[in-house]
Amino acid sequence: MSILAEKLSSILKRYDELTALLSSAEVVSDIKKLTELSKEQSSIEEISIASKEYLSVLENIKENKELLEDKELSELAKEELKILEIQKSDLETAIKQLLIPKDPNDDKNIYLELRAGTGGDEAGIFVGDLFKAYCRYADLKKWKVEIVSSSENSVGGYKEIIALIKGKGVYSRLKFEAGTHRVQRVPETESQGRIHTSAITVAIMPEVDDVEVSINPSDLKIEVFRAGGHGGQCVNTTDSAVRITHLPTNISVSMQDEKSQHKNKDKALKILKARLYEKQIEEQQLANAKDRKEQVGSGDRSERIRTYNYPQNRLSEHRINLTLYSLEEIMLSGNLDEVINPLIAHAQSQFE
C-alpha cells in the first residue's frame, strides 16, 4: 500500500470511530464533547468521501491488472484500466487539495485597514486608490463593504480607512494583502515629471466574536473626547469620540465617526478585538514558520510585499517574484485575482 493510501485509510478509520462515538450514550449526554467530535467529523467528511472513492479505484485497478492474463478479458481490462488511471489521477489531485490544512479563519469576514505611510499626500491619495480597487474586487465577489472609519487629508486622500467586508471566503482571498504596498508614480502636482515613491500599510483582521477574544475590562483604558472635523475644528459639542487602549499590549483604537458615544465605543471595541486577534495570528505564524518550507508572507505590516509602478504599468508581487504589466487594468477593474490566485497557489504548494 502506498503512503497516500495508508494515510487515507487512517482518515477513514478515524471517521468510522467518530461515527460510533457520536452515537454512544456517553457522548450524546455531553454537549461539549458532542460538539467537539461533530466538528472533527465534519472537518474530515469531504476527504473521507474522496478517500473511499480513491481506495475503490485502486482496488479496481488491481483486479483489472490481474485480468490482463486472461486472453478473453485482457482487451476489456486494458480499456477499463485507461479509464481507471484517469480517475486515479483526478482523485489524487483533488485529495492533495483536501489534505492541505484549513485556515480556521478562511470563512470569516474581515476588517480591512489601510494607512498612509511615507510619501506625504501622495501616500494618502494611494490609500484611496487601493481602497477603490478592493471595493471593485468585493463587488466582483458579491461581498458587502461597510466603511467603519475614515480620516481624510487635505488633498482628497486618506490618512486611514477601516472597512468591514462581509461575504463568503473574504479572509481566504484577502489575507495575503497584509503588509506594505509601495507606489511609484508622477503626482499630479509634480511639474518636473519626477517619479515619487510612497508607501501605505494594509492590515487584514478577521472579524471575531466574544468567545474567540476575551478581554478583561480592567485591562482597558477608555477615554472620551469631542469629535474633531477637518483641520481640527470642533464638529460636536458632546464628548462622543472614544479612544480605547488595551494596556497589556498598548494597542489603541480611536473612533469618532458616529454621533453616539455608545456606537463609537462599540465600533472601537470590535476593531480592538480584531487587532488583538490579528496579533495572535502573527505570533502563531512566526512560531510555525520554521516548520514550513517557506512563507508567502508573515502578514507583518512592515513587510514590503508589492510595488505598483505606474510609469511602467507594472505590478510586482515580491513574495513570489510575480510581475504583471497590466497595473492600470487591474486597479480599474478590481480584478485582483491575477495576483491573489498565484499567491494562494504558492501557499498551498508549501504543504505538498
Curated annotation (Swiss-Prot):
Q: Which domain of life does the UniProt lineage start with? A: Bacteria
**Chain residue ranges for the region called Disordered:** 288-309
Compositional bias per record (Basic and acidic residues), positions renumbered to this chain = 289-306
Indicate yes or no for the key word Protein biosynthesis.
yes
Q: How is it modified after translation?
A: Methylated by PrmC. Methylation increases the termination efficiency of RF1.
Cellular-component GO terms for this entry: cytoplasm
**What family is this protein classified in?**
Belongs to the prokaryotic/mitochondrial release factor family.
- The protein in question is named Peptide chain release factor 1
Recite the lineage of the species. Answer: Bacteria, Pseudomonadati, Campylobacterota, Epsilonproteobacteria, Campylobacterales
The gene behind this protein is prfA
